[in-house]
């Protein structure tokens, strides 16, 4: 496959034409009486018309046939997608999942949509407030099928296997250690090349943004130039009665048939697009004096709530970096948090837990549920002689953090068959080191 080209920049006002049809963008207006090449003009709105310019999201698509050219939608029963946060009783315990099992292609072919499983979530889709965390487990490409989400934005984190994603805006190749965001309403189809697994953070009613940098300054963390947007590409392909458009609407899946490929956009312009980002480009900020900094310094993207400084969801990574803090317990500290913390692992291991937390698995530490380094990590980090050291080389852990109290689904607790019933035992060996007659502990040699 030829190397794909992209446009650079987060949230930019962009325009793109398929080079096979030069001049396909109208000049000086959005919807002329007759578009170049006799295309249809269609606007895709990601915000209310009256939002301030700084938050107004929309794109104009110039396509061979408009999206409305389909037969009626009908409800389908496919995958394990849900928005029912009350199907099992709440569980405040620390939860950890072993790597989620990918179905074997020799037993059953499963594509991205049929391999979607909702793990946990909170909020209300109908009021555009909340989120869901999904796991996708698939072994075959989507053939003459596409998907779009009426409920929210998908932040997709592939863990195993490359994703070739066809969108109405063009094509993206997304590999492990990259992420992509497919925003609300955008149609896409995914080709896979092997048994494939990954994580999805879905947010309702808001879009992902770059976090404010404050005293960090003008540069740092995820820089806007490193986000890549696909360039226009179209196919004029007839599929008589055989192309299926799948829609997630109010948490349910629906399907409609049409006679053509939906990827028939010859040109587009706007600021409402899909995009991808390579996590290796994250510019890490860290403590260079003492103490363990809060993990918010590792925020890649945030979906803000109406409360200043409080997110519906943050996407946070724990990338390779230097650890140099003096007189400091360097691993993550013990913590009880008003936020919910879901963690996943793309590759390698996580610094606070060397065993049990594996690539393709996950953990959930719910609101105010205590968590922190396991006993082995505490003993080693408390006694090691401190020197500058590399941390997390060859690894990439991440966190979906939310101000919402997340409910785990029946699939997450039971049907996945991946819940680690012994997770709590990693803290059982912790013991008291209290020395009431000696304030100053001995320094490590």
From Swiss-Prot:
The gene is HGD. Catalyzes the conversion of homogentisate to maleylacetoacetate. It comes from the Eukaryota. Changing residue 168 to K: In AKU; loss of activity. It catalyses: homogentisate + O2 = 4-maleylacetoacetate + H(+). Highest expression in the prostate, small intestine, colon, kidney and liver. NCBIfam families: hmgA (TIGR01015). Transmembrane segments: none annotated. This is Homogentisate 1,2-dioxygenase. Its cofactor is Fe cation. Keywords: Acetylation, Dioxygenase, Disease variant, Iron, Metal-binding, Oxidoreductase, Phenylalanine catabolism, Tyrosine catabolism. One of its GO terms (biological process) is tyrosine catabolic process. Pathway: Amino-acid degradation; L-phenylalanine degradation; acetoacetate and fumarate from L-phenylalanine: step 4/6. The modification N6-succinyllysine is found at residue 414. Homohexamer arranged as a dimer of trimers. The keyword Secreted does not apply. It is linked to Alkaptonuria: An autosomal recessive error of metabolism characterized by an increase in the level of homogentisic acid. The clinical manifestations are urine that turns dark on standing and alkalinization, black ochronotic pigmentation of cartilage and collagenous tissues, and spine arthritis. Belongs to the homogentisate dioxygenase family. The lineage of its organism: Eukaryota, Metazoa, Chordata, Craniata, Vertebrata. Its EC number is 1.13.11.5. One of its GO terms (cellular component) is cytosol.
């Amino acid at each position: 496959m030829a190397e794909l080209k992209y446009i650079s920049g987060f949230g930019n006002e962009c325009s793109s034409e398929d080079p096979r049809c030069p001049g396909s963008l109208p000049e000086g207006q959005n919807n002329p009486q007759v578009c170049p090449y006799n295309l249809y003009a269609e606007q895709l709105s990601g915000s209310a018309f009256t939002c301030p310019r700084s938050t107004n999201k929309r794109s104009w698509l110039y396509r061979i046939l408009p999206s409305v050219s389909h037969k009626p939608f009908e409800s389908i029963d496919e995958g394990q997608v849900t928005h029912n946060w009350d199907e099992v009783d709440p569980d405040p315990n620390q939860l950890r999942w072993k790597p989620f099992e990918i179905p074997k292609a020799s037993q059953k072919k499963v594509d991205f949509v049929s391999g979607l499983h909702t793990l946990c979530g909170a909020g209300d889709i109908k009021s555009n407030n909340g989120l869901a965390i999904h796991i996708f487990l698939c072994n075959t490409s989507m053939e003459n099928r596409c998907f779009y989400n009426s409920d929210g934005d998908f932040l997709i984190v592939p863990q195993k296997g490359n994703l070739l994603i066809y969108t109405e805006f063009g094509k993206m190749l997304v590999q492990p250690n990259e992420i992509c965001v497919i925003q609300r309403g955008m149609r896409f189809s995914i080709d896979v090349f092997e048994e494939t697994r990954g994580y999805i953070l879905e947010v309702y009613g808001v879009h992902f943004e770059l976090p404010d940098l404050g005293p960090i300054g003008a540069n740092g963390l995820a820089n806007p130039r490193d986000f890549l947007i696909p360039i226009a590409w179209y196919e004029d392909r007839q599929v008589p009665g055989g192309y299926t458009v799948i829609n997630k609407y109010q948490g349910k899946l629906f399907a409609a048939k049409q006679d053509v490929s939906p990827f028939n956009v010859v040109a587009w312009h706007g600021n409402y697009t899909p995009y991808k980002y390579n996590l290796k480009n994250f510019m890490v900020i860290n403590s260079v004096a003492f103490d363990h900094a809060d993990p918010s310094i590792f925020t890649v993207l945030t979906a803000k709530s109406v409360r200043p400084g409080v997110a519906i969801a943050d996407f946070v990574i724990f990338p390779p970096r230097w650890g140099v803090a003096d007189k400091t317990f360097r691993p993550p500290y013990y913590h009880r948090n008003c936020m919910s913390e879901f963690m996943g692992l793309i590759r390698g291991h996580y610094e606070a837990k060397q065993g049990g937390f594996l690539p393709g698995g996950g953990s959930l530490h719910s609101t105010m549920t205590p968590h922190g380094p396991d006993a082995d990590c505490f003993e080693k980090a408390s006694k090691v002689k401190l020197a500058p050291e590399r941390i997390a080389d060859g690894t990439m852990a991440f966190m979906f953090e939310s101000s919402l109290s997340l409910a785990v689904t029946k699939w997450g607790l039971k049907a996945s068959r991946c819940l680690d019933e012994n997770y709590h035992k990693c803290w059982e060996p912790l013991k008291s080191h209290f020395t009431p007659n000696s304030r100053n502990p001995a320094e490590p040699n």
